[in-house]
Amino acid sequence: MEEIQRYLQPDRSQQHNFLYPLIFQEYIYALAHDHGLNRNRLILLENPGYNNKFSFLIVKRLITRMYQQNHFLISTNDSNKNAFLGCNKSLYSQMISEGFAFIVEIPFSLRLISSLSSFEGKKIFKSHNLRSIHSTFPFLEDNFSHLNYVLDILIPYPVHLEILVQTLRYWVKDASSLHLLRFFLHEYWNLNSLITSKKPGYSFSKKNQRFFFFLYNSYVYECESTFVFLRNQSSHLRSTSFGALLERIYFYGKIERLVEVFAKDFQITLWLFKDPFMHYVRYQGKSILASKGTFLLMNKWKFYLVNFWQCHFSLCFHTGRIHINQLSNHSRNFMGYLSSVRLNPSMVRSQMLENSFLINNAIKKFDTLVPLIPLIGSLAKANFCTVLGHPISKPVWSDLSDSDIIDRFGRICRNLFHYYSGSSKKKTLYRIKYILRLSCARTLARKHKSTVRTFFKRSGSELLEEFLTSEEQVLSLTFPRASSSLWGVYRSRIWYLDIFCINDLANYQ
């Protein structure tokens, strides 16, 4: 019981983060604008929804209006114009959200910088990555083929935006900033405009994605922390194999009920979860929980998660959002891969004196394949090829210089190879490279008003070899994390995928 209390004890550091004055500083909006511009260079294609109307004149006008407190009284009858935002509500609201998202990330960035500065002294650092849409428990690199069942979970969303604000108040103790956040959410957005998807899953609206990903992930971060607690307390190999799923979140009053339940009969409560082969992955609005256990165990997990999340996290959840699938009979599109477990037959001949025996063995093998058809569909949607995979030119890039055209195609090709480097079969990737190479050649030929054959004869095929063979240092999508606890320090094999923007080439569903 003392171990549980130590785990749930909040960290008293980083309690005073006075961020509200920063919302009136011009450089904050400039830094937020430049930060988004630099990060957009890492995605596969240019972001068509990026707002390039930033100027210091607009920032000065916005800050002046925010200083005038009377203008915070906004008439809700006029949805397009009001005294505070003036005539361009969409532009101002986007600037405020970008600036606020940059500000609320400052405490976590400072914690990361402080930890990195002391890393040379062999201090294990911890940091938050609350804009990522991924979080992983040891999964793909582990011996996944020995697992039996998978829970496919559609992560629910909070029933009210106020819950997002309450989640942040455990980390940011600046009441003024939280009041501004609450005012901003309730005046300019509602839950329907925040979540814009007609499918069973959901996605965020294209505007202000950085802001809402931060809020939503801080909320999901809290829900996922229950896996940390249960996994650490129940695993037979808890001290060496798995470590913690996430850094713990201190949900105070909500967790007190959980402590009371465990205090009554701790061992009886946790017997359902004693499974050393439990894996968790979150990808956008989905997550999976894989286990070596039986169907009965997974069914108990299912109903436990539904009841726990509904009671303690105010989630709009029902059992229809969780499906139990047998791993050997189902393949799934997850994290951009087509993953499946197949039986790999092998035959062993045994010779014993004059008798020989043939022994058939079926070995499970975990395959991660590149989904060719959806990926070609994404390329076709971006006008690199037809729906049948025939390369075509990219007319909108014809006005660029030759080097810029080659650089754009090369960056897309390298990023695709980098993202799908974990595939067990690379044949599909070489076909994608062929499509991009020929599309690049046809774009260059269109620019110079010639055929592809004539263009290659005049310029030489070496022109395109560079973007096919050159190695560029690409920012790694995964990086190791380290966690610490109040009763010791340990290194855990946890990876977070630093992906906060998904375009059509990766998000084909």
Swiss-Prot record:
Superkingdom as given in the UniProt entry: Eukaryota
GO molecular function, one term: RNA binding
Subcellular location: Plastid, Chloroplast
Chief location category: plastid
Gene Ontology cellular component annotations, sorted alphabetically: chloroplast
This protein's record includes keyword tRNA processing: yes
GO biological process, alphabetically ordered: mRNA processing; RNA splicing; tRNA processing
Keywords from the named record: Chloroplast, mRNA processing, Plastid, RNA-binding, tRNA processing
Cited InterPro entries: Domain_X (IPR024937), Maturase_MatK (IPR002866), Maturase_MatK_N (IPR024942)
Residues making up the signal peptide according to the UniProt record: none
PANTHER family cross-referenced by the UniProt entry: MATURASE K
Function statement: Usually encoded in the trnK tRNA gene intron. Probably assists in splicing its own and other chloroplast group II introns.
Family assignment from sequence similarity: Belongs to the intron maturase 2 family. MatK subfamily.
Protein name per its UniProtKB record: Maturase K
